[in-house]
């Protein structure tokens, strides 16, 4: 309670001081030409770093509207996680080697610190990666893939439809990596709570029920694929061929 009261007083004090602080900082100080040049270089570096990072994640690129590696799913192995962290560490080292914070504007100094903080957080996240529960009552890897395909994989051409099918095929490799990770964690005693099992099994079973798996209503992924292919600007024979391939 004492700590709560002290924190509350501190927040009130900051709120009271906010108008004065805003008044003092209302007029931004123009960055020097040198700082502007360094800012531009740093912005270009951040853009290159971002592009290099998302190149490791076909699914993230798809979510951003980029169709590179449109027929692939993410690599979710421990080795892939290590590669991602190694890339971020290398980018941080490159930034520190190529840029002098004292030559940057206030805005870019903040961006510098945020980039550094992001790598630090990635480092911690990777350190405790094995303690993460992959299965929860409200979702798991088996249900996230159908949701991803339905919500993010757009089909505006026959190659897009073929990429959709390729991703369904890729699911076997993807789930194999998930299974390998789960087994390794279980061997170390890291297992989701028992109450998660029943809803997870039920939700996962829903992924492989319905047509074309049985005589029920269309499976959500199958229904989504038919709808998207049906909307293609192509002749019916081409559409039918795409549907046969799934």
Q: Whereabouts are the PLM-identified features?
A:
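N-terminal maturation segment of proteins
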Residues: 23-245
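Gram-negative bacterial Sec-dependent N-terminal signal peptides
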Residues: 2-22
């Amino acid at each position: 309670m004492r700590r709560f009261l002290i924190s509350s007083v501190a927040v009130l004090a900051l709120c009271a001081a906010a108008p004065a602080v805003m008044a003092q900082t209302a007029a931004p100080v123009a960055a020097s030409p040198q700082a502007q040049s360094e800012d531009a270089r740093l912005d270009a570096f951040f853009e290159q770093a971002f592009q290099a990072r998302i190149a490791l994640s076909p699914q993230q690129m798809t979510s951003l509207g980029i169709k590179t590696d449109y027929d692939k799913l993410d690599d979710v192995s421990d080795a892939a996680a290590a590669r991602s962290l190694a890339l971020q560490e290398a980018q941080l080292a490159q930034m520190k080697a190529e840029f002098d914070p004292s030559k940057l504007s206030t805005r870019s100094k903040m961006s510098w610190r945020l980039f550094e903080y992001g790598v630090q957080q990635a480092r911690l996240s990777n350190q405790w990666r094995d303690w993460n529960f992959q299965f929860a009552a409200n979702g798991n890897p088996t249900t996230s893939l159908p949701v991803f395909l339905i919500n993010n994989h757009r089909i505006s051409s026959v190659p897009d439809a073929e990429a959709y099918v390729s991703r369904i095929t890729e699911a076997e490799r993807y789930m194999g990596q998930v299974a390998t990770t789960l087994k390794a964690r279980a061997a170390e005693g890291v297992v989701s709570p028992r109450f998660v099992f029943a809803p997870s099994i039920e939700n996962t079973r829903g992924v492989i029920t319905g047509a074309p798996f049985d005589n029920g209503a269309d499976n959500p992924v199958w229904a989504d694929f038919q709808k998207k292919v049906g909307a293609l600007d192509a002749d019916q024979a081409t559409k039918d061929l795409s549907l046969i391939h799934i």
